[in-house]
A protein has these predicted regions:
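The substrate-binding groove and active-site-proximal loops of carbohydrate-active enzymes
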Residues: 73-81
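N-terminal beta1-alpha1-beta2 module of alpha/beta enzyme domains
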Residues: 1-72
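Glycine-rich anion/phosphate-binding loops
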Residues: 20-24, 80-93
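A short, terminal or domain-edge coil/loop segment
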Residues: 59-61, 91-95
Length: 95
């Protein structure tokens, strides 16, 4: 079986909030892990009311804290918006 992955933007459902979106993403990652998925990706998006994945390293930490074996990572970081050193330090801390 090929290694399957998921890309999750942590969508905020109508009438809900970012906190619930992140809980939903964690639950989805847990279901994907049980189903045998290999990787779970999140991506950075800003100024979008319907997406809760602005702080990618925080989202990764939240999801990884609720899973055991699925690999959790970033599908995209907007480097022009961040100091490369800060990105390296944040992701180094997650290892």
């Amino acid at each position: 079986m090929p290694a399957l992955s998921v890309l999750d933007l942590s969508p905020i459902c109508e009438g809900s909030d970012a906190s619930q979106a992140l809980k939903n993403s964690r639950a989805l990652a847990q279901h994907c892990e049980k189903a045998g998925y290999h990787r779970y990706w999140v991506a950075e998006h800003h100024n979008m009311r319907g997406i809760a994945s602005a702080a990618t390293s925080v989202v990764i930490s939240h999801i990884a804290g609720g899973t055991q074996s699925i690999r959790v990572g970033s599908g995209g970081i907007m480097l022009p918006n961040h100091s490369p050193l800060m990105v390296a330090e944040q992701f180094g801390t997650l290892e």
